[in-house]
Amino acid sequence: MGRSNDFEVRQGSINTANARVRLADYVARRIAEHGVRHVFMLTGGGAMHLNDALGRAEGLHYVCCHHEQAAAMAAESYARLSGRMAAVNVTTGPGGINALNGVHGAYTDSIPMIVLSGQVKRETLRHNATVLVRQLGDQEADITDMVKSITKFAVTVSSPLDIRYLLEKALWLAESGRPGPVWLDIPIDIQSSLIEPARLRGFDPVAEGYGHEYAIPGEYGWLTGAALDRAAQDVVSAIREARRPVLMPGTGIRIAGVYEPFLELADKLGIAVAPAWNAQDLVPDNHPLYVGRPGTVGDRSGNFAVQCSDLLLVLGCRLNIRQISYNYAGFAPDAKKIMVDVDAPELFKPTISIDIPIHADLRTFVPAMIKALDGYEAPSAHRTYIDWAMERRRRYPAVLPEYWQTQGVVNPYCFTERLFEALEPDEVIVMADATAAVVTVQAAKLKKGQRLYSNSGAASMGYDLPATIGAWHAMPPTAKRVICLAGDGSIMQNFQELQTIIGQGIPAKIFLYNNSGYHSIRQTQQAYFDGHSVGCGPDSGVTFPDFGKVAQAFGFAYTRTSEHEDMVRAIADTLAAPGAAICEMFIDKGQNFAPKVSSRRLEDGSMVTAPLHDLAPFLPRDELIEAMRVPE
């Protein structure tokens, strides 16, 4: 992703242009110069000049989706996989509004994105009217007010003379500090106006008080230079003194572009590694330091390792509720918690209590840690704790022997285990939320180089197909396929993008978990409302099509399985099929997510949540006590 130094070089290149150009062409050229290569769009009259310019610009490839939500989700997935920001182009009114869900997902998960929306001409903007009206222009919507809480920067361009300044500011903010989406809303008469780029004022982050490449004005205690080195040395000293330290890396590792240095750091530290939710692909299952996946729907070994630790080093993970549960007071209760984050408020939010908050960027902190580890020798107690945690990994697998006894339907945990046995290293696997994500994160045995992700913060249904599209366009030309794990409920939310996959010739292998509805809410209703179901399947108002006929209609190869004995055949046929293919698995509706954190309702109606080490189905108390007995 482009940063400050690259930005200054690109900024200089545009100043040589003296000819008058259409503003829309200027925007397209500038984002291409900044490093944007793909634009995900749905055309519309309010954005017609932007559509035309983005379709003409050298160095830009436009990808047409059938819904603006899908375009935004595809752009998010593209940036997540490639490390390169994408653009989204939508029209005014409903076009912009439709994109909000995907933009929100990028905001929560810290993914850079620039949205370029069309808008009605300036004279018909409602805020220019002499009286207060709901709408003045045709299809007008005051989109920037709607998106300000889910973007880092959102503005309606009011003068052609401001375009360079606003565009440069938007691009800088999207990738600086904690990345996220930005939004430029451009009225149609401004899109078509002629400008002289050399006469336009630019954006200077230092002159505006941003101070340095990453920090936002007023942020707490930003560490650089000697202060950062001292902090790294202090962390190393604390780890050396600990007996049961755990390293919890999050998605911030890849966002910061320090994946390879992180692996070096982990090896030098030699302590247990328990990746956070959605960062499970940072280390393969056979990594010698990997002890499990902690979280509310993680595994027992990962949660035992974290809950019994005496030091927890959190790098690039914001410790959200899905990670630490609603019983956040009971999270890693005996651990000294050290957290490094680029976004200062995350260090001080009310759901966590951090002993050593470090406000720094992982781009500089990880190298500082590696430097501080020169000559370091890990205490023998650290290896003892890793061995202890590894033994619990072996003792408490996610896929239990009794799951294989299922008849007439497929157990999703068993299917996922078989699928990942068949997948190759370096595969890219995108997930929907709910069953497709929860079961996969628990049961998948990842190989070196595999990428596995969903959107975690928004966790919206409908992410699977758009994410597949975005991932494919981020993959190298040598890629032969992209794997999509979808749910029957989720896939319906952006059903139309099946045609986008077929139309663009994307060799997507879609594994469709069919549990006759919304299994996550079904489990909730069964647990808290005596089995009374509302809106979670065919028996409570939500119906689904025959997906075999759907596959045929769109032109997908199709296979199905409802027996364990047939799973390997179905997986092999799908992976070997030329082009796009769907494998539908009819899975056991009686299989709940397990293990998982459980809550119970008290007599006064309030809820109480069990701690992370005490997952449902609950272990016998004596077994739990023994499992948590740590080495001296």
Model region roles, listed by residue range:
Residues 2-19, 161, 209-215, 338-433, ...:
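Phosphate/pyrophosphate-binding active-site segments
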Residues 2-376, 422-425, 479, 507-510, ...:
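N-terminal alpha/beta PP-like core and its mobile active-site loop of ThDP/TPP-dependent enzymes
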Residues 24-27, 32-35, 42-45, 50-54, ...:
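Active-site diphosphate/adenylate-binding microenvironment
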Residues 44, 229, 256, 263, ...:
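Conserved structured core elements
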Residues 116, 124-138, 296, 350, ...:
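Thiamine diphosphate
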Residues 145-147, 391-397, 549-551:
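Short, basic/glycine-rich phosphate-binding loops at helix/coil junctions
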Residues 183, 339, 431, 485-486:
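Generic enzyme active-site microenvironment
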Residues 251-252, 317-318, 434, 487-489, ...:
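Active-site metal-binding loops of divalent metal-dependent hydrolases
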